[in-house]
Amino acid sequence: NGNPTQKYPDASLGYQACENAYQGIFKEGRHGAGTGATIGKIYGPKQASPSALATYAVQLGDLKVGAIVAVNAIGNIYAPTSGTTLSGIRNLKDGGFIDAEEALYTAILGRDLFHQNTTIGAIITNAKLDKTALTKVAGMAHDGYARVIKPVHTTFDGDSIYAMSSSTIPADINVVGTIAAYVMEKAILKTVDFNESSGV
């Protein structure tokens, strides 16, 4: 429900979420699964950056592929081409960011951070794909995680992606999977835009 002071999700909140979805009520940012989400938690919450829930979609002819993701990762978010840190572990001394992969090598040995992290996303498409093909698409979409989150897929993360389809448009699985990785990457990068004006 977007209010971090209220109770954990239960059946009544799940029912309300379904009603909201049916009515077309949806908010990106620090709402729903984005509430309280943070990234760059290797040194703990004090140096983490706020994260969010975001979406991104493209259309190629009649084919539509979209992604939704809530980023709550132990790692940082990086620009895919330059490698610049966009958000993550804060350097409390100079206000910049600390490289998450370098921090991983020394900071978390012997610490249990598993329960604090998960990046969870979904791919939604109108491609005609069966369950096996959609599982493959979800796997290919993980490339989007790996392009912009580092470290990613660690044992401290519960990274997962699901895929679903209205199954109306004939499409090649390789095309759908490649686009899925792209839109997931873009959705993750979009969470940074919501973070800049938010506190943890």
Where are these regions (language model features)?
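A structural signal for small-residue-enriched, beta-sheet-centric alpha/beta enzyme cores
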Residues: 1-200
